[in-house]
Amino acid sequence: MKNNGGARVVVIGAGFVGASYVFALMNQGIADEIVLIDANESKAIGDAMDFNHGKVFAPKPVDIWHGDYDDCRDADLVVICAGANQKPGETRLDLVDKNIAIFRSIVESVMASGFQGLFLVATNPVDILTYATWKFSGLPHERVIGSGTILDTARFRFLLGEYFSVAPQNVHAYIIGEHGDTELPVWSQAYIGVMPIRKLVESKGEEAQKDLERIFVNVRDAAYQIIEKKGATYYGIAMGLARVTRAILHNENAILTVSAYLDGLYGERDVYIGVPAVINRNGIREVIEIELNDDEKNRFHHSAATLKSVLARAFTR
């Protein structure tokens, strides 16, 4: 039973991402109960102790404890951060074989508890593992969400804000597709306030166009740069996960770029991929189909084809 009748989030995987996510939840007052599950039980116990010692500084009361899969029964949201990490030189897709086996065990254990909530997947390759979570869980696809390109979009908005000297909150631009090497920027629908970005740089010549391309490359390759410097990325994605969690638990109907299931939109079917979607307490209310130009359409189809190729290999063995 729930301790206080409030919103319960179960976090599976108390590594860098999982612990940073719990820290973000706690500091933003998003959840009422947070349960930590990790294969290394000692780590989960230690983290729960550490977080509880900081409860006096939190903006609202929160119950935090280390638990097991039985705690998923009454959870509103299970967030999966567990799995093998990306090493220097590895792509996110290199992690498929290692992590699908881990996910089958995790998801089946969660469902055996009687879980009836939503899944949020953070582990890479996130689009593939969100699809795997959906398959293994048997839940409707709208109740299984991946972090998708939420962090890529945040990086994009940050770098564009720096370039144009405006707050990133006033940059309206999206990265869609695979959370990985085939992702793409939607320049045709990118705005600073109400001004199209392409129009803003028109008069600045070819060098400004090259600047925009460099910004995208820095977005796409950011994880590689961070991993090379400090071994892993976790703060940015933790804050992105907290944002999705708030949209779910507070029933916000917020539009966020998550990994969502496509069943005809964007001309694609049977794939989870990063697209803008409306998120509320029921999960993905709807996917928003952006009007893409021909080049963007081709790049998006290439990204989807890359993911489908990996899925075909992973699920036919």
UniProtKB/Swiss-Prot annotation:
Pfam families: Ldh_1_C (PF02866), Ldh_1_N (PF00056)
Segments crossing the lipid bilayer: none
Modes of activity regulation: Allosterically activated by fructose 1,6-bisphosphate (FBP). The improvement in affinity for substrate occurs in two steps; the binding of fructose 1,6-bisphosphate (FBP) to the dimer, and the dimer to tetramer conversion.
Residues engaged in binding NAD(+): F16, V17, D38, K43, Y69, G83, A84, S105, A122, T123, N124, S147
Molecular function GO labels: L-lactate dehydrogenase activity; NAD binding
Residue sites binding substrate per the record: Q86, R92, N124, P125, V126, D127, D152, T153, A154, R155, T233
Enzyme nomenclature, EC number: 1.1.1.27
CC terms in the record's Gene Ontology section: cytoplasm
Subunit details: Exists as a dimer and a tetramer (dimer of dimers). The conversion occurs via the binding of fructose 1,6-bisphosphate (FBP) to the dimer.
Assigned protein family: Belongs to the LDH/MDH superfamily. LDH family.
Name by which UniProt lists this protein: L-lactate dehydrogenase
Species of the source: Geobacillus stearothermophilus
Lineage: Bacteria, Bacillati, Bacillota, Bacilli, Bacillales
